[in-house]
């Protein structure tokens, strides 16, 4: 497949993700928990993931704080029942999106994926957590605190993984986020029991040019004030 075709396919996928139907009406707002950490979470009541239904279940989130830059991000997911090889999930913010799950264990020569049932996992970026195993090839993942790398595959048959959680560090977290889950194959429905999204963020660095301009403006202001005072002190 050519690089141009690949890019077009990724763009089409991103557009499809942006148009996903929301499955819940509530808006989940990130809360500051101290030390630059912000968390949004949901723990039920349990939500069935519609079986073999691409509309899935979507959660709308909002990050109200401004002037920040993401340094780390993690997603915890708790799912029971079903067939893990059917599951698909993504996290999106603006034009950026990460594919969290894409039919774990499914390959071109085995499209059913892993038959294991239920997931209790922590997904993290590989750039900030070295040595993570790829969740797509992990049949029986350990529960947190063990972390795994998000799937990242646009198609479950891909070998490249451009859409992992590594797309988010250095981005501005402010604004709307979407967390989406779907079951892409018939039989063996899964139940979503909870999730949490944790973001670590720091203040945006001051632009050196703006800082220099501000310093010059302050200096000029002080000089002018001194000149005015001298005028009033003249006999």
Give names to the regions the model predicted.
Residues 2-11:
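Bacterial N-terminal signal peptides that target proteins for export
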Residues 21-25:
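Sec/Tat signal peptide C-region and signal peptidase I cleavage site
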Residues 26-201:
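Loop and turn regions of beta-sandwich accessory domains that flank beta-strands and are enriched
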Residues 204-224:
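A short, hydrophobic C-terminal helix/tail in secreted or cell-surface proteins
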